[in-house]
């Protein structure tokens, strides 16, 4: 009996040691976030072991775990019709909300899920529930795109998928089929999906052949640049779940099918050091000392290496491509973008990406709403139902949908 108690105590101590991580007191539901983070870390470690054993790529294994535990079939309710189909060869899940008697045509959002361009699915519970709620509360048609993921495809194939699916949807006959008003269509996405949505928005507003333009874009804690991994939010939140800095840098390397040997050099900005000529013209476009308010910059100092590793951008030139990093786009491109909503979270390495993009858009004359949550963390908006229901998840979702309701 005594040995059993000792063993149980030891196991509980080990579990507590594994689960506990120091978190800021201001973050929403800290113990619940620790449990969520521990679960995700466990899945990552299992997938890394599978990769080490040569059984599968670690990202395929990790996504298999995520999708297996969360996949949801296309189930319609009395209020929302849900169907799986494809648009120009790209899988989509369509959510058709209830019509308003006084409005024969509905508004619509094309939604792009997050997951570091490598994980998740439009068909997992979190995104299915989000899009169902959007369709019902907005009386809208939501098109959730099931774009292809790393490592099956790499940049720019993810962009191609969302462009093809969205262009197909914007055809007059397709909009008519779903009873959608051509003048009330927007694009949206979270995290890596926000990256793809921003890239698509820039591309569409330069496409003179498109008859139907996007009315709004709504970007949820978007990832927007890979030149500076030492912005104040990257420094402040380098170890904060569920997106530590080293994980975000690895997602970038994976997106470009790059070399993991570059990760540590990129973390300290060796890839954009002063001797890397390719990056010199772009630095002003993400100069956070001028783009961020002093309340954020505080005592943080820019990390600018005099000499670094020019081989990184030579082997991965996509790092400097505005299609992958919309924050570095030309000012002339930004000035034609539609009304924009950007949601940022305090406890997120990507916080400053969103704030800097909002500033650049405002400078270009775009109407922008920056919605910041002091207790938010990366990914929080999809965590709204038990057992992963967070107070800030519900508040961010409600704020996001309210903005869409007022502006779309």
UniProtKB/Swiss-Prot annotation:
The broad enzyme category this protein falls into is hydrolase
Which parts of the sequence lie on the Lumenal side of the lipid bilayer? 26-408
**In terms of one coarse class, where is the protein primarily found?**
membrane
Q: Where is this motif: Involved in the stabilization of the negatively charged intermediate by the formation of the oxyanion hole?
A: 113-115
Q: Name one GO molecular function term.
A: acetylalkylglycerol acetylhydrolase activity
UniProt-listed InterPro entries: AB_hydrolase_3 (IPR013094), AB_hydrolase_fold (IPR029058), Arylacetamide_deacetylase (IPR017157), GDXG_lipolytic_enzyme (IPR050300), Lipase_GDXG_put_SER_AS (IPR033140)
- A cellular component term (GO) from this record? endoplasmic reticulum
Natural source organism: Bos taurus (Bovine)
Q: Which PROSITE patterns match?
A: LIPASE_GDXG_SER (PS01174)
Recite the UniProt keywords alphabetically: Cell membrane, Endoplasmic reticulum, Glycoprotein, Hydrolase, Lipid degradation, Lipid metabolism, Membrane, Microsome, Signal-anchor, Transmembrane, Transmembrane helix
Q: How is it modified after translation?
A: N-glycosylated.
Q: What stretches pass through the bilayer?
A: 5-25
* Protein name from the UniProt record: Neutral cholesterol ester hydrolase 1
Annotated localization: Cell membrane; Microsome
Which residue positions are annotated as catalytic? 191, 348, 378
The keyword Transport appears for this protein: no
């Amino acid at each position: 009996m005594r040995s059993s108690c000792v063993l149980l105590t030891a196991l509980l101590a080990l579990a507590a040691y594994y689960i506990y991580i120091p978190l800021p007191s201001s973050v929403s539901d800290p113990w619940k976030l620790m449990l969520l983070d521990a679960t995700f870390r466990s899945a990552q470690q299992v997938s890394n072991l599978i990769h080490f054993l040569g059984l599968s790529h670690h990202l395929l294994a990790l996504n298999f775990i995520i999708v297996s535990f969360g996949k949801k079939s296309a189930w319609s309710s009395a209020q929302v019709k849900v169907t799986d189909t494809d648009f120009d060869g790209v899988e989509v899940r369509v959510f058709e909300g209830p019509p308003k008697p006084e409005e024969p045509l509905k508004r619509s959002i094309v939604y792009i899920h997050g997951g570091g361009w490598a994980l998740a699915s439009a068909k997992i519970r979190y995104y299915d529930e989000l899009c169902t709620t959007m369709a019902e509360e907005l009386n809208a048609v939501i098109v959730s795109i099931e774009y292809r993921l790393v490592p099956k495809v790499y940049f720019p194939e993810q962009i191609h998928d969302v462009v093809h699916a969205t262009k197909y949807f914007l055809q007059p006959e397709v909009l008519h089929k779903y009873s959608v008003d051509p003048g009330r269509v927007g694009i949206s996405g979270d995290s890596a999906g926000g990256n793809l949505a921003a890239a698509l928005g820039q591309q569409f507003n330069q496409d003179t052949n498109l008859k139907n333009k996007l009315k709004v874009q709504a970007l949820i804690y978007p990832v927007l640049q890979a030149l500076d991994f030492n912005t104040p939010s990257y420094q402040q939140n380098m170890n904060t779940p569920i997106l530590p800095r080293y994980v975000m840098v690895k997602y970038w390397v994976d997106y470009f099918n790059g070399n993991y040997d570059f990760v540590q050099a990129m973390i300290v900005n060796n890839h954009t050091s002063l001797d890397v000529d390719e990056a010199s013209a772009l630095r002003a476009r993400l100069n956070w000392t001028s783009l961020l308010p002093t309340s954020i910059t505080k005592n943080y100092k820019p990390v600018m290496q005099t000499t670094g590793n020019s081989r990184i951008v030579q082997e991965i030139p996509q790092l400097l491509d505005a299609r992958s990093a919309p924050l570095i786009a030309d000012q002339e491109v930004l000035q034609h973008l539609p009304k924009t909503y950007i949601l940022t979270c305090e406890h997120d390495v990507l916080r400053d990406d969103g704030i800097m993009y909002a500033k650049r858009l405002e400078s270009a004359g775009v109407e922008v709403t920056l919605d910041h949550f002091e207790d938010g963390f990366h990914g929080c908006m999809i965590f709204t139902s038990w057992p992963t229901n967070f107070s800030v998840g519900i508040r961010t979702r409600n704020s996001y949908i309210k903005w869409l309701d007022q502006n779309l």
